[in-house]
UniProtKB/Swiss-Prot annotation:
Keywords: Acyltransferase, Cytoplasm, Transferase. It catalyses: N-terminal L-alanyl-[ribosomal protein bS18] + acetyl-CoA = N-terminal N(alpha)-acetyl-L-alanyl-[ribosomal protein bS18] + CoA + H(+). GO terms for cellular component: cytoplasm. This is [Ribosomal protein bS18]-alanine N-acetyltransferase. InterPro entries: AcTrfase_RimI/Ard1, Acyl_CoA_acyltransferase, GNAT_dom, RimI, YpeA/RimI_acetyltransf. Pfam families: Acetyltransf_1. Belongs to the acetyltransferase family. RimI subfamily. GO terms for molecular function: protein-N-terminal-alanine acetyltransferase activity. It comes from Salmonella typhimurium (strain LT2 / SGSC1412 / ATCC 700720). Residues 2-147 form the N-acetyltransferase domain. Gene3D superfamilies: 3.40.630.30.
Length: 148
């Protein structure tokens, strides 16, 4: 059974392990552990009695920014990222958030397809934003109107 709940400080070491396993260029430890607090809505998804995914989202007034989402490679391709995002969007709507923003690597076709299927639209592009093994790649900034 899959459950979604708040990502607490006691969950951070397990989430940090997922961060390192799921991303080719993970956040620094300082950045990861620093994106917590009262302005954040950070969630975890548990599957098979194990943390399988997390989302780090900052909420400021009526806007939110999804800073980071990761699914453990052992749990990928099961729809858990979609499940976590749908839950996050529902929760943000109840809090009166009108727009959810995110950025995604231009090469991450699977994530872009997921975001588009949930109603996100491309807002702009940040050129040469993300590091790669060969240099840099663009970030696509996307927005989802949630409620008015």
């Amino acid at each position: 059974m899959n459950t979604i709940s708040i990502l607490s400080t006691t969950d951070l070491p397990a989430a940090w392990q997922i961060e390192q396993r799921a991303h080719a260029f993970p956040w620094s430890e300082k950045t990861f552990f620093g994106n917590q607090g009262e302005r954040y809505l950070n969630l975890k998804l548990t599957a098979d009695d194990r943390m399988a995914a997390f989302a780090i989202t900052q909420v400021v007034l009526d806007e939110a920014t999804l800073f980071n989402i990761a699914v453990d490679p052992d749990f990928q391709r099961r729809g858990l990222g979609r499940m976590l995002l749908e839950h996050l969007i529902d929760e943000l709507e109840t809090r009166g958030v009108v727009t959810l923003w995110l950025e995604v690597r231009a090469s991450n076709a699977a994530a872009i397809a997921l975001y588009e299927s949930l109603g996100f639209n491309e807002a702009t592009i940040r050129r040469n934003y993300y590091p790669t093994a060969q240099g840099h790649e663009d970030a696509i900034i996307m927005a989802l109107p949630i409620s008015m």
